[in-house]
């Protein structure tokens, strides 16, 4: 049974890998990637909150030092 000659394998595999790498790079160079989405400006709505003045009033009274 004849032996398999493996001496030429590195000279065959190395150019093949280089060619595959170059083809992949060229394909990636020609492909279009989407840009990251830009942030959409948010419009803040002011809702009528009846508890807000009361709550801030209570908090501000507690945070004040005691009056003498």
Curated annotation (Swiss-Prot):
The keyword Transmembrane applies. Keywords: Acetylation, ATP synthesis, CF(0), Hydrogen ion transport, Ion transport, Membrane, Mitochondrion, Transmembrane, Transmembrane helix, Transport. It comes from the Eukaryota. It is a single-pass membrane protein. It is found in: Mitochondrion membrane. Its main location: mitochondrion. The modification N6-succinyllysine is found at residue 54. GO terms for cellular component: mitochondrial membrane; proton-transporting ATP synthase complex. Pfam families: ATP-synt_8. Component of the ATP synthase complex composed at least of ATP5F1A/subunit alpha, ATP5F1B/subunit beta, ATP5MC1/subunit c (homooctomer), MT-ATP6/subunit a, MT-ATP8/subunit 8, ATP5ME/subunit e, ATP5MF/subunit f, ATP5MG/subunit g, ATP5MK/subunit k, ATP5MJ/subunit j, ATP5F1C/subunit gamma, ATP5F1D/subunit delta, ATP5F1E/subunit epsilon, ATP5PF/subunit F6, ATP5PB/subunit b, ATP5PD/subunit d, ATP5PO/subunit OSCP. Belongs to the ATPase protein 8 family. This is ATP synthase F(0) complex subunit 8.
């Amino acid at each position: 049974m004849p032996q398999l000659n493996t001496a030429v394998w590195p000279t065959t595999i190395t150019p093949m890998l280089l060619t595959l790498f170059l083809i992949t790079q060229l394909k990636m160079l020609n492909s279009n990637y989407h840009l990251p989405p830009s942030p959409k400006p948010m419009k803040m709505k002011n809702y009528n909150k009846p508890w807000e003045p009361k709550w801030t009033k209570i908090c501000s009274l507690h945070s004040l030092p005691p009056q003498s």
